[in-house]
């Protein structure tokens, strides 16, 4: 045992490095649960005030209504109905029902804080995501039928589209109580204030008049940047 201290120190350093590689997108809870309440008379955790644990009931961990179809009479022909469960606060998960009219879709978008898993309940969906430039922007896509499941990694562009002739229903579960949602089209062509059309025209190899048109589609209330 010539260098016992050095060996011990090396183990500590390796343990610290290994711990630094572990990622946690939602903070680990410091208690069994923190049921969110609107009143400001409790303990403040993860952006919400916690209900007194002595007053927590089973209903705080319950939600109904995911059996009710959403209104898909919209431009994109889809509707997302997230389950509103106060007890989800600090638990790092979320769930929603997604309804699609024939031809309806959830456009290319990003969840910056969570991976997502899709379970098809009814209909026929085309789903997919695109890898980063590290993997040459590869498209991973599948056609899903009832009972099929597909996973979307965190932070990558993804989409869901109903390619069937009937309505479709899916359940989406995410690994965060607040996964975030960034629509690619809205972010690029509907930002506030708007991105200069010259920049977008050059970036996407588009005629500047097409950029102006897309700006009106994604943000009809805003004026175009003077060029």
Swiss-Prot record:
PROSITE patterns xref list: GERMIN (PS00725)
One Pfam family of this chain: Cupin_1
Keyword Disulfide bond: yes
Molecular function GO terms recorded: manganese ion binding
Signal peptide: 1-24
UniProt-annotated location(s): Secreted, Extracellular space, Apoplast
List of residues binding Mn(2+): 109, 111, 116, 160
Positions of the Cupin type-1 domain: 64-212
Glycosylation sites: 136
InterPro entries (alphabetical): Cupin_1, Germin, Germin_Mn-BS, RmlC-like_jellyroll, RmlC_Cupin_sf
Keyword terms, alphabetized: Apoplast, Disulfide bond, Glycoprotein, Manganese, Metal-binding, Secreted, Signal
Gene Ontology, cellular component aspect: apoplast
Disulfide bonds: 34-50
Function: May play a role in plant defense. Probably has no oxalate oxidase activity even if the active site is conserved.
Summary of subunit composition and partner proteins: Oligomer (believed to be a pentamer but probably hexamer).
Membership in a protein family: Belongs to the germin family.
Identification of the protein by name: Germin-like protein subfamily 1 member 3
Protein source organism: Arabidopsis thaliana (Mouse-ear cress)
